[in-house]
C-alpha cells in the first residue's frame, strides 16, 4: 500500500510542476504591430505640425498622410489577426492540462504494470550487500567496503586473500596476504598462501621473494606440504635436479596415500629420475636456470614479457606432447595470470582431451578450473 501512496504523491508532484506554467494567466504582450501603429500616429501628428508651420506643401502633405494611413491600416489588420489566434493558444493549453491530468498517469501506470515488477521487493545496493546470499562477487564487494573503512582489520585481509586467489585476482591476493601478515603476523598458512600467490603472479616461477616466504612457512611448520612442494619446484627450475628429486621424494614419503597433490609430486619424481645427471638443457617450454636467475632480477614488465614467451613455448610443447598433466595445469594458470581467460578455457579443453574428466588426472584439471573460475562447460558433467 505504501508503494502506491508514494506513486500517487510522485505523480501529483510531477503533474503540478508541468501544469503550473500552463495554468498561469497569460499576460498580453504588446505586439510589434501595436508599436508600429503608435509610430504612425506620431508621424501623422508631426506631419500636421509641419503643414501648419509651412515646412511642407499641401500636395506633399496629402500624399504623405495617405501613405501613413495605408501603413496604419495594414498594421491594425495584422494586430487583429494576432488577437484572433489567442483563443486557439488557450485551447491548446487546456488540452495539455487534460493530457497531464488524465493521460500521463494512466500511460505511466500501464507501462510500469507491463514492464515493471510491482510485486518484487526493491533490491538497492545497500540491501544486497547486507544480504548477499550466494553471490560471491557481492561478498567480495562487501568485504572490500568493510576493509576500506577498517584497513587495520587483519582478519578481513586474511579472509579475502585466498578468495582473490581463487578468482584469479593475483595482484590483489598478493597485497591482501601481505597486509594480513603485517597486521596478524606470519603463520604457515599465510606465508604459504603468500608464496603461492607470488608464484602464480610470476607465471609459475618460484621467485626469490616466494622462496623467502616458503622458507619462513617451513620454519613455522616443517611438515607444511605446500611450502615443501614449491621449494622443491624452485630447485627443479634452478636446474638443481638432485636436490629437487630428494625434496620431492621426501614430500611423497610424508604425504598420505590419498593426498590430492601426490600424483603431481610423483610425476615430478618420474621426470627428475629420468633426466640425465646435472643441470642439462632445459626442456622446451621450461625456463633454463639462467632464465630463472635473470627473472628474479627483472622488473614486472620485463618479467611479464618473459612469461609470455615461456607460455607460448609451453603451448607449442604440449601440442607435440599432450601427455603432460603438469604442463596443462601450468598453461591454464599462466593464461589466467596473463588475463587471457578465453585461451585458458581452450587450454583446459585441450588438456581434458588428453586426460578425460572421468580419470584422476582429469579431475585435477577440473579442480584447477573451479579454483580459477573457468567454465569447463560440458566437460565437467
Swiss-Prot record:
InterPro entries: C-type_cytochrome_biogenesis, Cyt_c_biogenesis_CcmI, TPR-like_helical_dom_sf, TPR_CcmH_CycH. The keyword 4Fe-4S does not apply. GO terms for biological process: cytochrome complex assembly. It is a multi-pass membrane protein. Keywords: Cell inner membrane, Cell membrane, Cytochrome c-type biogenesis, Membrane, Repeat, TPR repeat, Transmembrane, Transmembrane helix. One of its GO terms (cellular component) is plasma membrane. The keyword Transferase does not apply. It is found in: Cell inner membrane. Required for the biogenesis of c-type cytochromes. Possible subunit of a heme lyase. Belongs to the CycH family. NCBIfam families: cytochro_ccmI (TIGR03142). This is Cytochrome c-type biogenesis protein CycH. It comes from Rhizobium meliloti (strain 1021) (Ensifer meliloti). The gene is cycH.
